[in-house]
Amino acid sequence: MKQFSQQITDKLYYIGTNDRITEQFENMWPLPDGVAYNSYIIKGSKNILLDSVKSTTIEECIRKLDEVLEGEELHYIIVHHMEPDHSSGIPTLLLKYPNCKLIANKRAVKMLESYYGIKEDELILVDDGETLELGDTKLTFYHTPMVHWPESMVSFEEETGTLFSQDIFGAFGTLDGAIYDDEVEFDRYYLEEMSRYYINIVGKYSGQALKALGKLGGLDIKMICPDHGPIWRNNIEKVIQIYTDLANQKTEDGVAIIFGSIYGNTERMAQLIAKGVAEEGLTNIRMHDVAKTPQSYLLADCWRYKGIILISCSYDKALFPPMAFLTNELKHQKMKNNIWGIAGSYSWNGGAIKGLKEFVEGEKLNVLPLMPEVMGAGSEKDFEDLINLGKMMAKAVKEGKVPEAE
């Protein structure tokens, strides 16, 4: 009986690892519940490992691999994706299995050499749509460039209908005992982390993600084995729909209010705007302090909610620096399905509202015509304008369009 690996099908085993040490994925995105690095081994007449793990957890992966191989050789390692959380364990694997061949595509060649000193003549290269017969296993490879690196690809094993999807359909969070979608409370523990993973890591490449989904749409998929998060065997249509909605940036009726405040006056502005939203009957309101909330969660809420209101104080005749950082990140996301509102504050020289206008106009975003700019603590007229901005946003969200400027 296998103690550490987990058998998936007659020939397929899970040998992935959990990382509860790394605090931020890509040193940017918080991991409050850790992350899993999924790796798989097909044990047949030729033994095939599908994706390695991060080097910090490779020994645990090898322990599981040895348990499955029972002294047999490892013949092939498939490199679906070169990001080091999936490839940095390769050198250790090659030290243990020096006769093993790597399978990758042309775009991975320079990366493998620059990261690990592996030369092109040591590789088996596969084209888009090419099928390889590796002993008694047949795999077809599909290139999925920029989902989310240029060399990214997936493979499909037709006999069992298994798609090895690399980062596509991935999610943050460790796998704590159970590894399948129907063995975990997905909506409770993983849905939010799947959304945040997509938005933070893949979102800016949504056009390419939709192309990849289209390319894979004709396959008879019975199971999806991603490189992060649970294995999908019982709700294939559900996860494909979740991913399609994310790639299309399907928004929900709600408003994310993000403020940058130093001494509390701008925060008070945000509270008045929220009051206006609520007075129009919109209940789905999220408010964040841009200086305290990690960018990961700010981007996720901006992607999710139809209405976004940015409120910033001025700082050295410009945007409050954390707000400036957020707007720069938002530019990369290329979000076009939102309705935007902006407001600014200043003490002697402005800059905040100017910076926010440059952002929404430069990105050609749908923005509300009312753009309050408040000096100091504000006046009664300012307070009225802020409440009206909230009301205007709530109406725009419910109607799905920006009102005409009066």
Residue ranges, per PLM feature:
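Active-site-proximal loop/helix segment associated with metal-binding centers of metalloenzymes
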Residues: H148-S152, I168-G203, D245-T251
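Terminal amphipathic helices with adjacent charged low-complexity linkers/tails
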Residues: H228-G254
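Active-site neighborhood of phospho(di)ester-bond hydrolases with catalytic His/Asp-centered motifs
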Residues: L50-S52, L74-M82, L102-N105, L163-Q166, ...
